[in-house]
């Protein structure tokens, strides 16, 4: 047992205890992808605003062209309207003729306006997207599984390796992965989980929160998972690790990176259990 490699502040932020030997581990991509997209969005927004302020100052007008071009057309028309001949420009063009000419001349600005609107809404799209469904580890039934887009990915490790840490590690074959944009100590713990249908492709699932609760969180998380799965009474022995002791720096980052207007995607317990039982019936292992 390697309890010295992890503590409750790390585990409680990454793992949820469900009871009866089952835990859920959060997905790395919840925060990793949002963090990358959020910073790109933020920097691009600032860049657009500064560029527009010091050059054309046209973003607001372009948005008006996209939302309601008549606002801009009427505004410009009043600037060219002949006070001696209401409804006509100095050049003698009627409002309808002027409108047609302006729509043809500034049609491209409607596309720019639509782009700015969608770009501003991008952040809203991110915050309405729920957090991904976590991966479950069932110590009593010796299962590792998760549900994704109607597909069950499941692994059943043999009883012979459950109490042997090295053999269990060899069977699960986890990996450590760090995206090139991240420092090595901010990496994830990756499990390759087979599809319930052996003829279909397995899924590599990065685990652990981003931003990590500590450096080399992936190593600490692996040690905990191995200890938990190898324990005879995991809920009692490791229950103390599921309660946070204090607030840490990564909490502030993670509130931003993982904020969502909707709760995390959960499991349909009855449907999931039925699929697991059907899979176990076909793939019994002692």
Language model features: what each stretch is:
Residues 12-23, 68, 74, 80-103, ...:
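N-terminal topogenic membrane-targeting module
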């Amino acid at each position: 047992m390697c309890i010295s490699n992890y503590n409750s502040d790390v585990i409680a932020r990454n793992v949820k205890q469900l009871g009866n030997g089952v835990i859920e581990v959060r997905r790395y991509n919840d925060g990793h992808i949002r963090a990358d997209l959020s910073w790109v969005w933020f920097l691009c927004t600032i860049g657009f605003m500064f560029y527009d302020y010091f050059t054309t100052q046209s973003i607001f007008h372009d948005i008006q062209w996209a939302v309601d071009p008549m606002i801009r057309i009427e505004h410009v028309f009043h600037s060219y309207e002949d006070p001696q001949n209401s409804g006509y420009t100095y050049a003698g063009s009627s409002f309808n003729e002027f409108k047609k000419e302006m729509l043809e001349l500034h049609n491209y600005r409607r596309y720019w306006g639509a782009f700015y609107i969608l770009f501003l809404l991008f952040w809203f799209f991110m915050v309405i997207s729920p957090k991904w469904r976590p991966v479950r580890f069932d110590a009593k039934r010796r299962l590792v599984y998760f549900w994704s887009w109607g597909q069950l990915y499941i692994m059943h490790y043999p009883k012979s390796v459950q109490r042997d840490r090295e053999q269990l590690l060899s069977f699960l074959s986890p990996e450590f992965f760090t995206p090139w944009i991240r420092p090595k100590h901010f990496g994830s713990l990756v499990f390759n989980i087979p599809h319930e249908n052996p003829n279909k492709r397995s899924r590599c699932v990065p685990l652990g929160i981003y931003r990590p609760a500590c450096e080399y969180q992936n190593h600490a998380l692996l040690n905990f998972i191995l200890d938990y799965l190898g324990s005879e009474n995991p809920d009692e022995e490791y229950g103390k690790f599921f309660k946070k002791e204090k607030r840490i720096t990564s909490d502030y980052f993670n509130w931003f990176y993982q904020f969502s207007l909707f709760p995390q995607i959960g499991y349909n317990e009855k449907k999931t259990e039925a699929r697991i039982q059907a899979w176990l019936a076909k793939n019994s292992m002692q």
